[in-house]
């Protein structure tokens, strides 16, 4: 069984923020594939399923998302290598997309929570959201909406990442990485 997790914060206040790009990708996948909602309170998230594939949007806040993922992982007996986490990354320019297995949290509190609850060797789909001018602005930056110019590209970016995630269901990580990685939004056709 494969588990795709989109990181984000619950509630309409955060819906279109940089931090919620992972939720947008999960929404796209669920819509494209027609996955059905199988959520239960115990999962602490919106959980969808189609065949042997699960899609999770934790409804805990970002900093606590590891608990939701751990619960789903244990309930469905999912191996760590079958978990794919989609998240924002301020260390990448807007629109960049990178894939890797394992690694550090890079200051991302959602990943920090995840690492503490399930370990580090899951696949990460990192989506660049750009970086604020000063480190002290990071929290405000990721909790704000994209700029008008960026907003125009979000739908295409989300579709690209969604297609990459679908490819991960049947292709090797390195093959997906070589085809779907982007250095910036300009690389998106």
Swiss-Prot record:
Entry's Gene Ontology molecular function annotations: peptidyl-tRNA hydrolase activity; tRNA binding
Annotated EC: 3.1.1.29
GO terms under biological process: protein quality control for misfolded or incompletely synthesized proteins; rescue of stalled ribosome
Protein's cellular compartments: Cytoplasm
Residues with site note (Discriminates between blocked and unblocked aminoacyl-tRNA): 9
Keywords noted in UniProt: Cytoplasm, Hydrolase, RNA-binding, tRNA-binding
Site (Stabilizes the basic form of H active site to accept a proton): 88
Main location: cytoplasm
CDD domains for this protein: PTH
Pfam families: Pept_tRNA_hydro
Binding site for tRNA: 14, 61, 63, 109
Subunit structure: Monomer.
Function: Hydrolyzes ribosome-free peptidyl-tRNAs (with 1 or more amino acids incorporated), which drop off the ribosome during protein synthesis, or as a result of ribosome stalling. Catalyzes the release of premature peptidyl moieties from peptidyl-tRNA molecules trapped in stalled 50S ribosomal subunits, and thus maintains levels of free tRNAs and 50S ribosomes.
UniProt record similarity statement: Belongs to the PTH family.
Protein name: Peptidyl-tRNA hydrolase
Species, as recorded: Sulfurovum sp. (strain NBC37-1)
């Amino acid at each position: 069984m494969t588990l795709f997790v989109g990181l984000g914060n619950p509630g309409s206040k955060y819906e279109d923020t940089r931090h919620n790009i992972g939720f947008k990708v999960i929404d796209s996948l669920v819509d494209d594939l027609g996955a059905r909602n199988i959520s239960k309170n115990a999962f602490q998230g919106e959980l969808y399923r189609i065949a042997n594939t699960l899609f999770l949007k934790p409804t805990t806040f970002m900093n606590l998302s590891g608990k939701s993922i751990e619960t789903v992982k244990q309930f469905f007996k999912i191996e760590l290598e079958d978990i794919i986490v989609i998240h924002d990354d301020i260390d990448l320019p807007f629109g960049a997309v990178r894939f890797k297995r394992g690694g550090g949290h890079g200051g991302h509190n959602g990943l920090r929570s995840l690492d503490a609850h399930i370990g580090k060797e899951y696949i990460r789909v990192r989506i660049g959201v750009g970086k604020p001018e000063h480190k002290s602005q990071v929290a405000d930056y990721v909790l704000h909406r994209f700029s008008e110019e960026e907003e125009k590209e979000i739908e295409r970016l989300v579709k690209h990442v969604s297609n990459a995630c679908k490819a991960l269901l049947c292709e090797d990580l390195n093959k997906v990485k070589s085809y779907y990685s982007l250095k910036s939004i300009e690389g998106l056709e």
